[in-house]
Amino acid sequence: MELGIVAKRETPRAVELADRIRRHVDVPVTLDNLTADELDANGTDVTSLSACDLVVSIGGDGTFLFAAREVSPTPVLGVNLGEVGFLNAVSPEECVETVAGVVERMQAGDAELQELPQLQATGPGLSLPAAVNEVAVLGPQRGRDNGLDIDVRVNGEGYSSGRADGVLVSTPTGSTAYNLSEGGPIVHPDVSAFVVTEMCAESSMPSLAVPTDRTITVHVDGADHAVVAADGRTRSQVAPPAEITLAVAADPVRIAGPKLEFFTALDKLD
């Protein structure tokens, strides 16, 4: 078995914990390049850590999302450095023992893994990674007299059409992120649904929860271009008229370690 570690960049506490973990576990450990440089060790790019059996992310949800995108479907264990931490269930004080315990259980073949759905966007000229949090389909810019014409369908049945700044489709994981700021609902992680939320629509429909086995299509027109963004990091332009298809991705995010105390994390949103 091999363990990979990704630590939040420019964060001495994260690097310190990475060093403690690698010295404690009794399996080969590979560090991401930036962490390895801090510890004067050999490292590799984060994508190559997908060859490991388990990857430990040390930081906040952003670090976890970055690691999960790069190494999926390799399981990820998140160590939370005091942020909201909807994805990171392990505290710094418990991380060394927790990682060692998960490694032992994985070696014995009895580790429990939680799987979270990802969202895949496809369409003309699109080349986007699967999204852990959300996919946004946006006009050239937001605001009055901007946006684009949209037609949203679920398995071919019409949900909404009209002028809007865009459409946001969120996973349960992403429901506490961009989706929440756009007025969408929080979705419990045990609920297998995507959330469709229009963004500043002229005739807005309420947000819609859609089973993850359904296909969502967004037809866009009425603008010189549209932008499709996965998790706010990777963007691609499409030329209207065009249709973007959103469906559950082939590979889920797999989380190792203790299960998240969801309602405890919600308290930190205040």
Curated annotation (Swiss-Prot):
Its cofactor is a divalent metal cation. NAD(+) binds at residues 61-62, 133-134, 144, 163, 165, 176-181. The keyword NAD applies. One of its GO terms (cellular component) is cytoplasm. GO terms for molecular function: ATP binding; metal ion binding; NAD+ kinase activity. It is found in: Cytoplasm. It comes from the Archaea. The keyword NAD applies. Its EC number is 2.7.1.23. It is an enzyme of class 2 (transferase). One of its GO terms (biological process) is NAD metabolic process. The active site is at residue 61. Keywords: ATP-binding, Cytoplasm, Kinase, NAD, NADP, Nucleotide-binding, Transferase. It catalyses: NAD(+) + ATP = ADP + NADP(+) + H(+). Pfam families: NAD_kinase, NAD_kinase_C. InterPro entries: ATP-NAD_kinase_N, ATP-NAD_kinase_PpnK-typ_C, NAD/diacylglycerol_kinase_sf, NADK. PANTHER family: BIFUNCTIONAL NADP PHOSPHATASE_NAD KINASE (PTHR20275:SF43), NAD KINASE (PTHR20275). Belongs to the NAD kinase family. HAMAP family: NAD_kinase. Involved in the regulation of the intracellular balance of NAD and NADP, and is a key enzyme in the biosynthesis of NADP. Catalyzes specifically the phosphorylation on 2'-hydroxyl of the adenosine moiety of NAD to yield NADP. This is NAD kinase. The gene is nadK.
